[in-house]
Amino acid sequence: MVWNVAILGATGVVGQRFIQLLYNHPWFKIEVLAASEKSAGKSFGKVCNWTLESEMPREVAEMQVVNSDVKSVEKAGNIDFVFSALPSEIAGPVEEEFAKKYPVFSKASSHRLEEDAPLLVPEVNPEHLELVKIQKERRNWDGFISTDPNCSTIQLVITLKPLMQFGLKKVIVSTMQALSGAGFPGVSSLSIIDNVLPYISGEEEKIELETLKILGNLDDGKIQPASIKVSASCNRVNVKDGHLECVFVELERSVSVEDVKEAFRNFKGEPQTLKLPSAPENPIIVREEEDRPQPRFDRNEGKGMSVVVGRIRRDNVLTIKYLCLSHNTIRGAA
């Protein structure tokens, strides 16, 4: 069976990734492309500044863009699912209107921390999808909203999940985040050349709060946040794609570096068990070289869906430290 999907915010960087990953997908067919009112009524190829490394599919280029409202989308085609890449400042009410009738999978931050909305990383917390039933009953919707975490949170929690068996207590993370994470046109060249920007608005708070929800337990229809402490510092660096994070963790148990490497290598999630089409064979890849991972060499591992970990060491202050890298607009966004 193939499901028809609408992509909201299709002309942006995340919307383009949705198109790239859903075009020719065995389960989904792109039925409707929606964007802003100024783009509506025009062909996608004329209004989209395509920034990805692959060519824009000709069939997609010829599709007519519609406005991002339920009436316009329904008029353009019959849909089963909605993928939302809308900016967070407008996503909230628009997604809620669609969710009254359709399943909505959102990249925006608008609904991430709502108590009845799953904040989902499929390898980490698939059981949180139980919230969908509660959400539909509470809001009297036929559809629902499931949210996707911040790009820098996703790769972090994928690496933290296998460490929870050792008793996770504290996490300190410092990020070096790629330019594409700021969207297009993004950061001005004069601001980033020969420079590092030591502040990304709202990013640290997202990591600290989202991590607790994702790693929390579903109990009696509510998420009980994980009882760990998370501290984040975020920086924008002059790299096109691929977020690199320095992670320091305190564990309850005394573990060796080899214990941690083995936990990373053996980690599999529900997508791997089900052999889902977009799931990487290995959600975490361990590199042994002293100077890896690096964005240029490692961001496309697992077709951009794997998290690459390296420099795993004992830490003199906490327990273990390591670096992790992931493609921020593939695993991290779409």
Segments predicted by a language model, with ranges:
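N-terminal Rossmann-like NAD(P) cofactor-binding subdomain of oxidoreductases
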Residues: 1-199, 229, 272-276, 283, ...
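Charged docking surfaces used in two-component/phosphorelay signaling
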Residues: 180-334
